[in-house]
UniProtKB/Swiss-Prot annotation:
Disulfide bond residue pairs: 570-601, 589-603, 694-778
UniProt organism field: Homo sapiens (Human)
Pfam families reported for this sequence: 7tm_2, GPS
Disease: Congenital bilateral aplasia of the vas deferens, X-linked: A disease characterized by bilateral absence of vas deferens, obstructive azoospermia, and infertility.
Low complexity bias spans: 308-320
Tissue-level expression: Epididymis-specific expression (at protein level). Both subunits are associated with apical membranes of efferent ductule and proximal epididymal duct epithelia. Mainly expressed in the nonciliated principal cells of the proximal excurrent ducts. Specifically over-expressed in Ewing sarcomas but also up-regulated in a number of carcinomas derived from prostate, kidney or lung.
Classification of source organism: Eukaryota, Metazoa, Chordata, Craniata, Vertebrata
UniProt feature, compositional bias: Polar residues: 321-335, 344-366
Reported impact of residue 794 to A: Decreased ability to activate G-proteins
Cytoplasmic side: 649-667, 715-737, 811-834, 879-1017
Protein name according to UniProt: Adhesion G-protein coupled receptor G2
Length: 1017
């Protein structure tokens, strides 16, 4: 009550009392609130007696996966003491989140099961009691003697507890308080376990400990929900009833790093319960059985131990269980004194399941994911490789390995990269060696799924592998892809139609793999590219399946919706890239359809002539490949026509085919003609999808390509003999030996390849037309064969031809410099004509293939396609149209009227029509300006005359003339090389030849008894 005594506002004594009372009430309320808050804070941790020294040890996973230890000593802290006695040494702290009114605080409630996905949090306490005067704790078996005497007894206890929790959990947080007076160590810990990890394993490892599942936690609306045990320590969480294992459950003390991990038999998982896993009591001494609505499979632990009964307890809220049969991870021996047995896959003792449709590998946490070094990862991979080397693999052990690989996929990328290829091989080998009785089997884990189906190669049906729900990965084999899948791969029914007979017997199973994370597929060479989908793969009994009559279709959902303006590529993992480390390649893969959330891929190729020497063996854009294809086929068609004309000309007219260069040219034209014809027929024959016919066409294409290369090299070798070995050189059956090399060596190479494996050749798709139809082509399928027998073979020929080309050019320059003043000089056009003709004759233009790389790839592909497909056309121009003696033969026999030449018009002349009569016999005698050469094997000369005509005299006195430096004799066919390849010795001759003075040179030919007069070019 307030009284106003005065108007001036003075307050009476009663008013002062009331004001004081109000202030006192406010202080009491604040005190109550503060005390309540302190009580709730103290309930969140395990506290030791007042005189105790409290040590808080926090383990947080560091960046490299190794727990970092932080120790804080708290002195003179008043804490509530956990009641303890000699008989009961372990208590569970119940963390309360209810206020004084009994109502749960209505703040942001986090459902941990929705956060953890495949894990669960547990809270537990344990109290160790030890004898202060003993160097070894009473209830522990210390096998690592190095710790004794170095650490204090409490530190030793804490160290062993740390190792146990580190081994059994994904992550954990621990806080310990030491009571020296009572010789006790009280520890409270929060651990994160995999949702299929049996919590009794922790109870077995930690003697007399109780574990409580954590479910709901309340936190401030400004704070995100927790994801680690450290964050949970700061919050108020509900604890469910403790998990109780029966009294006769195998117990064991905490163990050191040298001991094996104590694990108990798995509890039965009832998949009928959609969101809960119940711990039921399995029968003693029996394999653990996972009950599913469909046929049941029995799975036996690796080292069978008497199964302890597990009492029922409230269900743990976990993600929905797969309707597949689960198998446990490797379990080591558990007893009161556990022997040092290592958990490995090398010596499994597993019983085969009686009826198995699909098997799901549960993600049991028995190994450390965040290892301290790459050596730990390598040891785990090595254990799996050793187990696979033993042969057949049972489903439960295979499931354990799949789960092990799944956990390793979450290791740091820099540590995982060196082992990526080995892990991929482990996954493939698991599918190859998996032993199962039914038609199909599947193994799933959080990040990896594998499915294997038994097939009959002769009656294979269209099969679709489907992966669904990345949060709870499930796979299935369907006849068609569902709409809600995250990845599918469809194999056509014609998948194995083109397999060889011996491979048909091996193709008894098809394996599918799905990787939820691309950890094993890191390509450092990618620039401005990133993987936006999951990874899916398929293989047929580890065989190389090519020659598909229908494409394989792959549909992959994007992890994040892609932007419309970005370019999406379909790629595959090429194990040969990046020095054998593997890398992404889009060779042969194209986008069939692109949507906002998914991409449909298919594989095919377009074929251009450049694919024969495409060193990178990669494809370009469809529009460019279409243009290259048109250029290729038009060029090959023109070359075939003009090569045929060249062959008919040189074969029909005897006078122009007598010399060696002409005979070699005939062989080269024949090889190029056959190469172009087979290439033109290849794509047409590929449409029939006949394996034997396709292999035959590919073999002939390869053979004629090598023959063409070889005759180009023989052209260069012939020029070398003419320039360097002019004198004292005689080769018996010269052209016959050239033919044996030119046609025989490629035949040997192709025969060796066929002997090794005919499957090195076959049908392949090398691109796609803009309308989506594939362009199939019969060619070399094996990259090693291609690079050795095509690229390597061509490199040798190309280097020889380039060297010879340079030598010829240098020699021509020297000849021109030696000419006397006033002598007739060639024009620049003539020089360019000679160089161009030599370029196409020696196949120098094939060298464009070496520059078809990087940003100039397309440019050189165009140059390659234009010049090499038209090689036959250019040979016709330079060696038929540009040669006057060939033109005269055409005019004589093919023309009529004024264009027709008379029989002997300006072609064949005797030695008296401009030259003094002279006798040519065995040997040649000349004046002091002449050059004579003789040997035991040959005694013939060739006379080169710098004139517009030439006279060739044989032993019988017959002679012939020609222009442009190509000469031949009438009877024996002895010839010289083309004039631009001759090594000439000039001398003056005071005789007229064809109305002019000439300079003459002598050169030896390969036979006896003939003298040739050839004009200077």
């Amino acid at each position: 009550m307030v009284f106003s005594v005065r108007q001036c506002g003075h307050v009476g004594r009663t008013e002062e009392v009331l004001l004081t009372f109000k202030i006192f009430l406010v202080i009491i309320c604040l005190h109550v609130v503060l005390v309540t808050s302190l009580e709730e804070d103290t309930d969140n941790s395990s506290l030791s007696p007042p005189p105790a020294k409290l040590s808080v040890v926090s383990f947080a996973p560091s960046s490299n996966g190794t727990p970092e230890v932080e120790t804080t000593s708290l002195n003179d802290v008043t804490l509530s003491l956990l009641p303890s006695n000699e008989t009961e040494k372990t208590k569970i702290t119940i963390v309360k989140t209810f206020n004084a009114s009994g109502v749960k605080p209505q703040r942001n409630i986090c459902n941990l099961s929705s956060i953890c996905n495949d894990s669960a949090f547990f809270r537990g306490e344990i109290m160790f009691q030890y004898d202060k005067e003993s160097t070894v704790p009473q209830n522990q078996h210390i096998t690592n003697g190095t710790l004794t005497g170095v650490l204090s007894l409490s530190e030793l206890k804490r160290s062993e507890l740390n190792k146990t929790l580190q081994t059994l959990s994904e992550t954990y947080f621990i806080m310990c308080a030491t009571a020296e007076a009572q010789s006790t160590l009280n520890c409270t810990f929060t651990i994160k376990l995999n949702n299929t990890m049996n919590a009794c394993a922790v109870i077995a490892a930690l003697e007399r400990v109780k574990i409580r599942p954590m479910e709901h936690c309340c936190c401030s609306v400004r704070i995100p929900c927790p994801s680690s045990p450290e964050e949970l320590e700061k919050l108020q969480c509900d604890l469910q009833d403790p998990i109780v294992c029966l009294a006769d459950h195998p117990r064991g003390p905490p163990f050191s790093s040298s001991q094996s991990i104590p694990v108990v038999p798995r509890a039965t998982v009832l998949s009928q319960v959609p969101k809960a896993t119940s711990f039921a009591e399995p029968p003693d001494y029996s394999p653990v059985t996972h009950n599913v609505p469909s046929p049941i499979g029995e799975i036996q632990p690796l080292s069978p131990q008497p199964s302890a009964p597990i009492a029922s307890s409230p269900a743990i809220d976990m993600p929905p269980q797969s309707e597949t049969i689960s198998s446990p991870m490797p379990q080591t021996h558990v007893s009161g004194t556990p022997p040092p047995v290592k958990a490995s896959f090398s010596s499994p003792t597993v019983s085969a399941p009686a009826n198995v449709n699909t098997t799901s590998a549960p993600p049991v946490q028995t190994d450390i994911v965040n290892t301290s070094s790459i050596s730990d990862l390598e040891n785990q991979v090595l254990q799996m490789e050793k187990a696979l080397s033993l042969g057949s693999l049972e489903p439960n052990l295979a499931g354990e390995m799949i789960n092990q690989v799944s956990r390793l996929l979450h290791s740091p990328p820099d540590m995982l990269a060196p082992l990526a290829q080995r892990l991929l091989k482990v996954v493939d080998d698991i599918g190859l060696q998996l032993n199962f009785s039914n038609t199909t089997i599947s193994l799933t884990s959080p990040s990896l799924a594998l499915a294997v189906i038994r097939v009959n190669a002769s009656s294979f049906n269209t099969t679709t592998f489907v992966a669904q729900d990345p949060a709870n990965l499930q796979v299935s084999l369907e006849t068609q892809a569902p709409e809600n899948s995250i990845g599918t791969i469809t194999l056509p029914s014609s998948l194995m139609n083109n397999l060889p007979a011996h491979d048909m017997e091996l193709a008894s199973r098809v394996q599918f793999n799905f990787f939820e994370t691309p950890a094993l597929f890191q390509d450092p060479s990618l620039e401005n590219l990133s993987l936006i989908s999951y990874v899916i793969s398929s293989s047929v009994a580890n065989l190389t399946v090519r020659n598909l009559t229908r494409n394989v279709t792959v549909t992959l959902k994007h992890i994040n919706p892609s932007q419309d303006e970005l370019t999406v590529r379909c790629v595959f993992w090429d194990l040969g890239r990046n020095g054998g480390r593997g890398g992404w390649s889009d060779n042969g893969c194209s986008v069939k359809d692109r949507r906002l959330n998914e991409t449909i891929c298919t594989c095919s190729h377009l074929t251009s002539f450049g694919v024969l020497l495409d060193l990178s063996r990669t494809s370009v854009l469809p529009a460019q490949m279409m243009a290259l294809t048109f250029i290729t086929y038009i060029g090959c068609g023109l070359s075939s026509i003009f090569l045929s004309v060249t062959l008919v000309t040189y074969i029909a007219f005897e006078k122009i085919r007598r010399d060696y260069p002409s005979k070699i040219l005939i062989q080269l034209c024949a090889a190029l003609l056959l190469l172009n014809l087979v290439f033109l027929l290849d794509s047409w024959i590929a449409l029939y999808k006949m394996q034997g016919l396709c292999i035959s066409v590919a073999v002939f294409l390869h053979y004629f390509l090598l023959v063409s290369f070889t005759w180009m090299g023989l052209e260069a070798f012939h020029m070398y003999l003419a320039l360097v070995k002019v004198f004292n050189t005689y080769i018996r059956k010269y052209i016959l030996k050239f033919c044996i090399v030119g046609w025989g060596v490629p035949a040997v190479v192709v025969t060796i390849i066929l002997t090794i494996s005919p499957d090195n050749y076959g049908l392949g798709s090398y691109g796609k037309f803009p309308n989506g139809s594939p362009d199939d082509f019969c060619w070399i399928n094996n990259n090693a064969v291609f690079y050795i027998t095509v690229v390597g073979y061509f490199c040798v020929i190309f280097l020889l031809n380039v060297s010879m080309f340079i030598v010829v050019l240098v020699q021509l320059c020297r000849i021109k410099k030696k000419k006397q003043l006033g002598a007739q000089r060639k024009t620049s056009i003539q020089d360019l004509r000679s160089i161009a003709g030599l370029t196409f004759l020696l196949g120098i233009t094939w060298g464009f293939a070496f520059f078809a790389w990087g940003p100039v790839n397309v440019t050189f592909m165009y140059l390659f396609a234009i010049f090499n497909t038209l090689q036959g056309f250019f040979i016709f121009i330079f060696y038929c149209v540009a040669k006057e003696n060939v033109r005269k033969q055409w005019r004589r026999y093919l023309c009529c009227g004024k264009l027709r030449l008379a029989e002997n018009s300006d072609w064949s002349k005797t030695a008296t029509n401009g030259l003094k009569k002279q006798t040519v016999n065995q040997g040649v005698s000349s004046s002091s300006n002449s050059l004579q050469s003789s040997s035991n094997s040959t005694n013939s000369t060739t006379l080169l005359v710098n004139n517009d005509c030439s006279v060739h005299a044989s032993g019988n006195g017959n002679a012939s003339t020609e222009r442009n430096g190509v000469s031949f004799s009438v009877q024996n066919g002895d010839v010289c090389l083309h004039d631009f390849t001759g090594k000439q010795h000039m001398f003056n001759e005071k005789e007229d030849s064809c109305n002019g003075k000439g300079r003459m040179a002598l050169r030896r030919t390969s036979k006896r008894g003939s003298l040739h007069f050839i004009e200077q070019m």
